[in-house]
């Protein structure tokens, strides 16, 4: 049916009259929708691709099944620690940051992963096998988590004094630990920043 149209977005829309009027396409599934496939032989069978994975509908989008047995996610960056076996840290689109084991007895399942940050997860780096530094988009929520005590120090992002031109941050702003001194951290927006005390103080170095 050429008049049956879909416009995908964070609130996908549907038209049944060639685009003259639009309504919300579906509820309870998706988020940032990226692709939809419709069976050419049965238009009621649909597969939706979105930031959290895929959804399957057999009734034209009225009801959906989220295929939660598929390990689907959009990772921006990966970090590891020095545990044995080591843990993997990942920043994920729309799903924050997660930590999971690199190996275990039996298979690794979704339940083995724990949430360690919010927003759109970005960089996750570990110093001294104890301090985790991570952030969300545009360096938001940049903080330090003590993996031994679970104490979190948030708001480590550097801001210039009021009245000065503020920094511009990339969607995923790099965080790097010095290989020579684990207390020294580098963070970057439109300038490179250096901290000598685990992110508690910053100096512009570029």
Whereabouts are the PLM-identified features?
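Beta-propeller blade termini and top-face loops
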Residues: 1-206
């Amino acid at each position: 049916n050429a008049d049956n149209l879909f416009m995908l977005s964070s609130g996908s829309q549907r038209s049944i009259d060639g685009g003259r009027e639009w309504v919300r396409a579906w509820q309870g599934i998706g988020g940032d929708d990226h692709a939809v496939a419709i069976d050419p032989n049965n238009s009621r069978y649909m597969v939706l691709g979105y930031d959290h994975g895929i959804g399957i509908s057999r009734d034209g989008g009225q009801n959906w099944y989220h295929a939660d047995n598929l390990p689907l996610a959009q990772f921006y960056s990966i970090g590891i620690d020095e545990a044995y076996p080591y843990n993997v840290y990942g920043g994920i689109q729309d799903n924050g940051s997660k930590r999971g084991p690199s190996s275990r007895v039996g298979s690794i399942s979704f339940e083995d992963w724990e949430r360690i940050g919010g927003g759109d997860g970005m960089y996750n780096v570990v110093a001294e096998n104890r301090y985790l530094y991570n952030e969300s988009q545009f360096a938001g929520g940049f903080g330090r988590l003590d993996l031994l005590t679970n104490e979190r120090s948030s708001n480590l992002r550097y801001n210039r004094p009021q009245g000065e031109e503020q920094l511009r941050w990339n969607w995923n702003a790099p965080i790097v630990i010095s290989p020579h001194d684990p207390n020294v951290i580098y963070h970057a927006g439109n300038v490179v920043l250096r901290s000598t005390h685990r992110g508690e103080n910053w100096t512009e170095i570029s």
